[in-house]
Structures are given as C-alpha cells and as structure tokens.
C-alpha cells in the first residue's frame, strides 16, 4: 500500500516557518558581545581589570609568520591564547584561560587578524565558560585595522606577558 503525502505546496511553507522560528529562538540566546575599535583597545590595554588577548596562532603573536598586509607581532600588553586551544576538555581549557590571566573578573578584549577568530573565542568564552557578555569585547578591526594607524605598533615577543617562551599553546600541547 502506497503512502499518500501532503503536496509540496503545503509542506514547504510549514518547513520554512519551522526553520524561521528555530532561528528566531536561537538568535534570542546569541551572546551580545560588543565590538570595539582601536581607540578602545589603546585606552584599556594595560589597565587593571582588563586583559587584551591575541587569538591568533603563536607564530603570528611572536611575529614569526606575518601575513600580507599585517606585520608580525602583537598589540602591546596582549597575551596569546590561540583560538585552537579551545579544542580541549572544558576543565583543562578553563585552567589554561586562568593561567593566561583570562578570568571572569576582568574585561576581556580579543583580537586576531580580521576579527573572525576573535569573534569565535569571544563566543566560546560566553557560551562555554559563562563569561558575562558585557565583559567580553571583540576588536573586529583587529591587526589589519590596528596597523593602519601610525600611533599603533605591533611588538615582537614581550617578556612582560610571560608568554614569549611559555605560551598557552605550548602548555596545552605539552611542549
């Protein structure tokens, strides 16, 4: 016996409505992470209660693999916490975040090359590690924008951060 299905003209709008409602509900739970600009980063970098985080791979942070249009190095005072470090178990990654000084009591300003990896890291801090969205900032312009202003510099390894020889990625990978 052959089953009779409703016509596509009836099913398609119902599926569309269902998908739309799921997207609408999901958007209500999106973390509301604020995008900031270079002036905000300059103003708050190094201030008590703030931490600037470079979400790029360690080689970019250290200036060993510059990209076209972006010289190597990092924003002064930034710590390195590569986005790929999020791949581990939540308890281990939480320990790495704390060791890097990325804690819930600070406002975290995250950057990368163009704001994509930093947005992902910001999203994970809010969703997975329960950081308050108001305390997580994404520098969307990141290093591409940063180097356009002659007042801004990218530094080579900075021993003040404690990450030049002992980066979060080295600890995570057991190096």
PLM regions and their residue ranges:
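Short, surface-exposed ligand- or partner-binding patches at beta-edge/loop junctions that are enriched
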Residues: 111-112
